[in-house]
Amino acid sequence: MKKVRIGVLGAYRGTSMINYCKRADHAEVVAICDKSPEALDAQRAAAEGLDIAFYERFDDFIEHNMDAVVLANYANEHAPFAIRCLKKGLHVFSEVLPVQNMKEAVELVEAVEESGLVYAYGENYCTCPRPMK
């Protein structure tokens, strides 16, 4: 089975997803982007020996060869960055909040429909039994 190549935007908030993908048989992290050099340095240290590219600029990150992007960045950036990813041909998994207003909601829905790609909104359920253990 071909692994899904995943890029993660948000090195701090995205740490759980990065760690999950490192262990998964069906996915691999191929790129990590964050504005913070310190956050990238921490992920570089944790990724020693793995073939992961690191970016400080989203414009460079989005050009990397990947299949999907996890948006674990600032909430006010989720819709604009999701739309850019979809237009680039990338599937999107977005953390909360997906949009800031109705205009962004309409633009995001239109981008998903036009692209035919998967957009997933990852609501956290911290009160579910498993996370509470």
Where on the chain are the PLM-derived regions?
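Oxidoreductase and adenylate-handling cofactor-binding alpha/beta cores
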Residues: 127-133
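Short acidic low-complexity segments
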Residues: 52-64
